[in-house]
Amino acid sequence: MEIIDRFTNLEYGKVRYSITGEASDNLVVLMHGLTTSKDIYNNLTQNLIEQEFQVLSFDFYGRGKSDYVPNVDSENLYVNQAMELIEKFIPTGAKRNINLIGYSAGGSIASMVADRLENCASLILIASTGVPQIPTSPVLISLLQTFESNGEISSELKHEVEKQMVQELEVLEENETKDLALKVYNDLDIWNEKTIDTVKNHLLSTGGYVGDKSMNSIFESIGKKNIPTFIMAGSNDNWVSPESGKEIHKLIEGSLFFEFEDVTHWAFLEKPEVYHRKILTFLKSA
């Protein structure tokens, strides 16, 4: 089935989204990462609709083709965006099983949405942020420090960041997933002023990697509400340490955790068949 992109106006601007698959009691909502767009989920979307799930995917403000919002100072902007969009597809009083999947920075947002929803059937976190941690890559640490000091990104640092991105693309063995990752990054236009501002403010709104703004109470609340939660991490992730996943697992009582050996931050693009199988198995059991 073709993924058809549409646009809708929400409180803070125009948002690109797609809702794919036949109407179903089981809705899966996909939330992308800090520097990606909804397109990162195209292959997973097809797998999900083949299993009779309906899939809602969208670009966060300032990413993909959604409107840029300046001066973001809280992740609540993105949480409210997700809630507003979900409510557009859930008639008042209707009961649907809403399953949330969050990747990277989208994981912490998905967690906050799960805690707010009255009918969250399950939560899947992939290489998720949400607890204090330092990336293993010196290049990324330098970029974060530049953001936190409100400094200018030097041409040397830009070169090193681009070099690392190219190196990480090499782990993607399948041409289809590599082409998809390249498209996402090319569309992002990473050094565009608005893109830099969006990424910087999103990071700083969470307290950055040092975690000045704790989410522990959110994760603990998810556990108390008995929301089935599956957490996945990769042992070679340079962007979000697998220790983050382990810590979130401890905070969400009753959650499941799996660490993929030798897998990077690309996660489901690097090992699509394995990730997709585990995701579908969990969704069907939740």
Regions found by a protein language model. Give the residues of each.
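Alpha/beta-hydrolase fold catalytic core
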Residues: 1-29, 50-53, 90-91, 121, ...
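Conserved HGGG/HGGXW glycine-rich cap/lid loop of the alpha/beta-hydrolase fold
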Residues: 19-67
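Active-site loop/oxyanion-hole signature of alpha/beta-hydrolase fold enzymes
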Residues: 60-101, 105, 277
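Flexible "cap/lid" loop of the alpha/beta hydrolase fold
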Residues: 115, 123-155
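Conserved alpha/beta-hydrolase catalytic His-Asp/Glu region
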Residues: 134, 155-223
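Short beta-strand/loop motif that positions the catalytic acidic residue
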Residues: 225, 231-233
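Conserved alpha/beta-hydrolase "acid-adjacent" motif
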Residues: 238-244
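Catalytic histidine-centered segment of alpha/beta-hydrolase-like enzymes
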Residues: 239, 260-272, 276
